[in-house]
């Protein structure tokens, strides 16, 4: 069986019948235990061919201390120049793009993340302090100082 032709047929079927095509083909009870490890059991569900990508990518840890909040965003294979951070007050947007150096038809197996991504990170009200970012070893560290503001005296009325 020619894998490339099968892949093209599957992509065509998904485009014609929408993103839920494979969910309609396979029953929920047909999933085996090894298919329920956090990944979708349906072919191509993690990489939408229309450019939306995997909503869970990139994975992220959040560390909340007394003075700051640190976001650790895991971007294996990405370089600093592939990634951009935008601050919109109530949220951050981390986006990037990475391309393969190989021709698509030369892949026998392809599990790496290629193409573009965008992750929106909501921020709580007290996160409006100084921000800085470091990219090291495929991990983007974004640190935001907590801004608790100045204490205000509240007068107690009689």
From Swiss-Prot:
Keyword Iron annotated: no
Classification via SUPFAM superfamilies: HSP20-like chaperones
Keywords (A to Z) from UniProt: Cytoplasm, Stress response
Phenotype when the gene is knocked out: Deletion of the gene increases sensitivity toward salt stress.
Recorded superkingdom: Bacteria
Primary localization class, coarse: cytoplasm
Domain annotation sHSP: ranges: 51-158
Subcellular location: Cytoplasm
InterPro entries per record: A-crystallin/Hsp20_dom, HSP20-like_chaperone
Keyword Isomerase tagged: no
Induction conditions: Induced upon salt stress conditions.
Pfam (any one): HSP20
GO CC field: cytoplasm
Family statement: Belongs to the small heat shock protein (HSP20) family.
Its job: Part of the cellular protein quality control system with a specific role in salt stress response. May facilitate protein homeostasis, together with chemical chaperones that accumulate during the salt stress response. Increased levels of YocM protects against both heat and salt stress. In vitro, displays an unusual aggregase chaperone activity.
Assembly notes: Forms homodimers, homotetramers and higher oligomers.
Protein's name according to its UniProt entry: Salt stress-responsive protein YocM
Gene: yocM
């Amino acid at each position: 069986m020619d894998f490339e032709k099968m892949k093209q047929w599957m992509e065509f079927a998904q485009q014609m019948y929408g993103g839920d095509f494979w969910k309609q083909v396979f029953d929920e009870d047909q999933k085996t235990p090894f298919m329920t490890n956090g990944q979708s059991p349906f072919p191509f569900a993690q990489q939408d061919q229309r450019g939306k990508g995997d909503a869970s990518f990139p994975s992220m840890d959040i560390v909340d201390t007394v003075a700051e909040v640190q976001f650790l965003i895991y971007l294996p294979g990405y370089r600093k120049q592939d990634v951009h951070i935008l601050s919109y007050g109530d949220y951050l947007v981390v986006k990037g793009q990475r391309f393969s150096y190989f021709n698509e038809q030369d892949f026998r197996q392809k599990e790496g993340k290629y193409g573009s991504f965008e992750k929106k990170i909501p921020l709580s009200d007290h996160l409006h302090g100084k921000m800085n970012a470091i990219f090291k070893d495929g991990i983007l560290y974004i640190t935001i100082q907590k801004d608790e503001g100045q204490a205000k005296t509240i007068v107690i009325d009689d």
